[in-house]
């Protein structure tokens, strides 16, 4: 059993057919880098009902968490909100630079371009054809995105990550992937019928 201090991060989700691939890939990476395997939730539990259901499933052994434990995952990382004042400050810095919706694509956090993740993620979440960046709903989404980014930025800064496995390279899912790429960490997207390796020239499967 690998006992190093580094971590393989594998996304925690309900994509049952992908779990077999995650199992093999995470264990290969764990052996290669002598790393522990941690799973992670890619987003916050902003919905209290969803959070309650998550823990009820764990209690009654209905959770996919036990599938992850079966292939060596030691713990699951759930994002936590940062200091509100700090996030508000960072949000205002970003928002004040937005003069048109095209500027959204230029959003950079810690020298990482995440504008496309914000743009596409917002449209997907609210099923909208386009963005009005002056609406409260977009501002709340952007603030939440920035909060999530800085949780993962701090996690990468405070832990030794050897590799990451994500389900998607877009929306909020792409945050962990891009942080890994920025830090020269081996990054993969994987599913039931594919495994892609990613770097600075190839941060998406599209």
Predicted regions and their residues:
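Short alpha-helical
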Residues: 16-17, 171-174
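A short, glycine/small-residue-rich beta-strand->loop->alpha-helix junction that serves as a flexible
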Residues: 11-22
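Glycosyltransferases and closely related glycan-assembly transferases
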Residues: 27-31, 156-163, 175-186
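Well-ordered alpha-helical segments embedded in enzymatic catalytic cores
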Residues: 144-154
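Conserved N-terminal ligand/cofactor-binding loop architecture of enzyme catalytic domains
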Residues: 1-11, 28, 32-146, 192-206
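Short N-terminal targeting/anchoring amphipathic segment
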Residues: 3-9, 156-169
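Beta-rich, aromatic/charged-enriched effector core domains that present basic-aromatic interfaces
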Residues: 165-167, 174, 181-206
